[in-house]
A protein has these predicted regions:
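Short aromatic-glycine-(Arg/Gly/Cys) micro-motifs in beta-strand/loop hairpins
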Residues: 8-21
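A short, exposed loop/beta-hairpin motif centered on an aromatic-Gly-Thr core
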Residues: 24-33
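Short, charged, surface-exposed hinge/linker loops at domain edges
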Residues: 1-5, 12, 38-72
């Protein structure tokens, strides 16, 4: 089974903060966006394993974010 999650990346002074919208406990930091993506995927994999071991329900994915542009 494949589940899609929505990642949100925020630029910080030391790189990037990555967090899943549907599962906010899955969060990480990386010095580059590529590193942050890889670390977020690793964190998600570890969280899924932990939830399964604890018999907890894995949050559903599927949210969609869209950037809305406006001229100011």
């Amino acid at each position: 089974m494949t589940i899609g999650y929505t990642a949100k990346y925020t630029k910080t002074s030391s790189g990037y903060l990555g967090q899943l919208v549907e599962w906010p406990e899955v969060v990480t930091e990386g010095t580059t966006i590529e590193e942050c993506r890889a670390l977020l995927r690793d964190a998600l994999t570890e969280m899924i394993l932990a939830y399964r071991q604890q018999g907890r329900e894995i949050p559903p994915g599927g949210d969609l974010l869209e950037q809305v542009l406006v001229e100011v």
